[in-house]
Amino acid sequence: NPSSPPVVDTTNTTSYPPMCSQDAVGGQVLENIPLQEDCLYNFNTVPYIVGIIPEDIIPVAIEK
């Protein structure tokens, strides 16, 4: 979509255990603890709650 802003920051989430990438450095402490998070749920709800991003921009994490 030409009206969408460019992606300015990405994180390779395939290099880490199953967890969302909000705090990759802090998350390394938890590497040995079995975690599962629904990143799609977290990315789509948290920014709207705290009002970080405009409503027309929806960050989505896709895990393979």
From Swiss-Prot:
Gene Ontology cellular-component annotations: endoplasmic reticulum
Complex and partners: Monomer and homotrimer.
Any one Gene Ontology BP term: fatty acid metabolic process
Keyword hit for Endoplasmic reticulum: yes
Family: Belongs to the type-B carboxylesterase/lipase family.
Molecular-function annotations in GO: hydrolase activity
Reactions listed under catalytic activity: hexadecanoyl-CoA + H2O = hexadecanoate + CoA + H(+)
Name listed for the protein in its UniProt record: Palmitoyl-CoA hydrolase
Functional note: Hydrolysis of a variety of CoA thioesters of long-chain fatty acids.
Annotated keywords: Endoplasmic reticulum, Fatty acid metabolism, Hydrolase, Lipid metabolism, Microsome
Enzyme Commission code(s) on record: 3.1.2.2
